[in-house]
Amino acid sequence: MPGGDEMRKARVERTTKESSVLVEINLDGTGEISVETGVPFFDHMLSQLGKHSGFDLTVKTTGDVDVDSHHTVEDTSLAFGQALREALGDKAGIRRFGDAMVPLDEVLVQAAVDLSGRPYLVHRQPEIVELIGTFDTTLGKHIWESIVAEARIALHIRVLEG
């Protein structure tokens, strides 16, 4: 943990033709979460990630969701990954490796992470339904690809059930 007034936090703004994104993250926060992307299930995913990680997370995205959610989800994920990398800084005092197996209702997920500085993703899941509400589930892997690329982490995710 940082000493004194040092905080592991970052603010990233990303603007493209299709979207405008603001991500603020404080790894030493208290679990305050505010996520608004215009894509409800993606908001839920990011909110749960922040909540269960115990950090503060603010995400404000406006995008061309009237066309589809691809650009909004991609640009937000890239900005989140960059903010995570910046907040981790030199990673002093942080264990390099971590893993968990978590049941989420009907879903069982196993994840392992390496804060190596080298982006790499393995994402395995069984056949999925195309939509959860209005969310295009084919974007799931792309979310993680985008986060991994900017966070510069190695991540293995296996959806074992559900």
Q: Which residues make up each language-model segment?
A:
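Structural preference for solvent-exposed beta-strand-turn elements
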Residues: 5-162
